[in-house]
Regions:
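Conserved acidic donor-binding segment of nucleotide-sugar-dependent glycosyltransferases
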Residues: 455-476, 486-491
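Carbohydrate-associated surface elements
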Residues: 276, 297
Length: 538
């Protein structure tokens, strides 16, 4: 697909996509596409923000189609060096840097609010410009002063680049706001940079802002923050002091906490996918009166139709559909298949999901499978494309098979069980898609997995029963035990779980329900200012 982006001066809804649609395959990207395609009555724009255009030596490529009602797409990178203005020695504004110091103090201490002046886009374009922040004498004085006051034992170069990288995106985002098309409703699918951009846009245009959190962004950043390749402050381990990394990590954690609250405060509606996430939002600073649950929905009829391609007694294939990244804990799944294979030699583990995001982790997973005698040799991937065809992978003697991102309508009919071994999830669409295709699920107790598998909407949902099983995280033996239980088809457990999953997804998680809920919210807001909607719903 060539990178010919649609552009428009005017859209109904602007979605802010942080590292997801249209480049990165995954659940949030699929949700964005589903929302746009399922809402043809509105015109949409997407503002994509990523870290860098070149990742692991390769340029990001478009991974999803553009629906007809996607009228505008723009792409920005927060940490590409070519976004910085040319260096020039300047003094900088005293008053402006007092505000920057207040901003810094608000990031440093979660109890402090972000200064009100920073809600105004003119602060970033007139008071303290991007050039002021990068090159002025007052900026250097500010960084030097805060370093001496807070962490003089940390190497200055580490502190300098951390502080720069924390603050730099704010000016990049402010510049984006100035050039966005005319928009009726802003919608962020996460807090973080996307949520900050949404809040800043809403303040600038006085237009409504919706926030939909698929996972709890701040909590997930605490898990994987130091894995980003733009946070570079390595030091020989023998020379490290325990507090060195703790202070710099705390700076990042507080930053994401703070911009999350900034987005919560500005959002007219704060949406989550399940009750557990709603409670976490409130504990992180969201106004409970603004929160609402809208579960994901799937195209039940299309997926249910794939059951005609299913064998009456399926092969003993356990499929993990998800990106091959550490947060999905693919290694625990591989270990679980090894344990299960000692009791059930015919079992196979299929890994179906994007492999281009973390090539080092993909290599580690393949090497583990080879060392456990579950895989014969390493596959070579060019982006998401394997050096083996899907047919060759399926027919190989391997017990662990990597398919890359694939059409689940072809994968699910061949799968007996679906699994997730993740250490963090929001509300995984893949579980619901599996239910609709007649595939029970064994998953770790993260996000809404328990609610989906055991029921959580209401008492009637719970009474339906269990459409699979839940285990603890990082417990391959527990996963293996459940795989063996369900794949012993004679005991009737698999058939019972399949029927419960089909009933649950039909009753509570149809795509039409999800789209109807968003249509109601959009219709209620689309002709109003932020203030008018605030008065209407409060």
């Amino acid at each position: 697909m060539s990178e010919q982006f649609p552009t428009s001066d005017n859209v109904d809804i602007m979605l802010f996509s942080e590292g997801t649609y249209p480049y990165v395959k995954g659940g949030v990207s699929a949700w964005i596409l589903q929302l746009i395609e399922g809402s043809p009555q509105y015109t949409f724009g997407v503002c994509f923000i990523g870290a860098q255009e070149i990742m692991d030596g390769k340029k990001l490529e478009i991974s999803y189609r553009f629906p007809e009602n996607l009228k505008h797409l723009e792409v920005h990178y927060l940490f590409d060096n070519d976004s910085a203005p040319l260096a020039k020695r300047i003094k900088g504004s005293k008053e402006g840097f007092e505000a920057v110091e207040n901003l810094y103090n608000s990031f440093k201490d979660i109890k402090n609010d972000i200064p009100k002046i920073l809600q105004n886009i003119e602060f970033y374009t007139k008071e303290v410009t991007f050039k002021d922040f990068l090159y002025s004498e007052r900026s250097w004085e500010f960084i030097s002063k805060t370093y001496e006051e807070n962490c003089p034992d940390v190497p200055f170069v580490d502190y300098f680049w951390t502080l720069r990288n924390i603050h730099k995106p704010i000016w990049v985002l402010a510049e984006i706001v100035q050039n966005l098309p005319k928009t009726k409703v802003f919608h962020a699918p996460s807090t973080g940079y996307a949520g900050f951009l949404g809040a800043l846009s809403s303040y600038d245009r006085n237009k409504p802002l919706f926030l939909t959190e698929h996972g709890i962004y701040t909590r997930e950043r605490k898990i994987d923050m130091l894995s980003a390749d733009w946070i570079e402050y390595k030091k020989p381990s023998l020379l490290q002091q325990p507090e060195e990394y703790n202070y710099i990590k705390r700076m990042w954690v507080n930053f994401f906490d703070k911009i999350g609250v900034f987005c919560y405060h500005r959002s007219n509606h704060i949406l989550s996918l399940f009750s557990g996430a709603q409670k976490i939002q409130i504990s992180f600073g969201a106004d409970a009166s603004k929160t609402q649950i809208i579960p994901n929905g799937v195209d039940v009829d299309t997926l249910k139709a794939t059951m005609k391609n299913r064998q009456e007694i399926p092969k003993k294939i356990v499929t993990l559909i998800g990106r091959v990244v550490p947060i999905k804990d693919i290694k625990t799944f591989i270990r679980a298949i090894k344990i299960a294979s000692e009791t059930m030699p015919e079992i196979e583990g299929w890994i179906v999901g994007a492999v281009e995001e973390d090539s080092e982790y993909v290599d580690e997973c393949q090497q583990m499978a080879i060392s456990l005698a579950l895989k014969n040799k390493k596959q070579i991937f060019d982006g998401n494309k394997s050096d083996m065809t899907a047919e060759e992978i399926e027919n190989s003697a391997d017990k662990i098979k990597l398919f890359g991102h694939s059409d689940i309508k072809k994968i699910l009919p061949k799968s007996a069980l679906q699994t997730l071994s993740s250490i963090s999830e929001g509300m995984p669409l893949v579980i619901l898609e599996g239910f609709a295709a007649g595939v029970p699920c064994v998953a770790t107790d993260v996000g809404s997995c328990r609610d989906l598998i055991e029921g959580g909407i209401n008492e009637e949902d719970i009474a339906l029963g269990k459409a699979g099983a839940i285990t603890g995280i990082a417990n391959p033996a527990a996963l293996a035990k459940e795989y063996i239980r369900f794949l012993n088809f004679e005991n009737g457990e698999w058939k019972k779980a399949q029927e419960i999953g089909l009933k649950r997804v039909e009753k509570y998680y149809r795509q039409e329900m999800f789209l109807k809920d968003y249509k109601k919210l959009y219709d209620n807001a689309i002709d109003l200012s932020w203030d008018q909607l605030f008065e209407k719903v409060n």
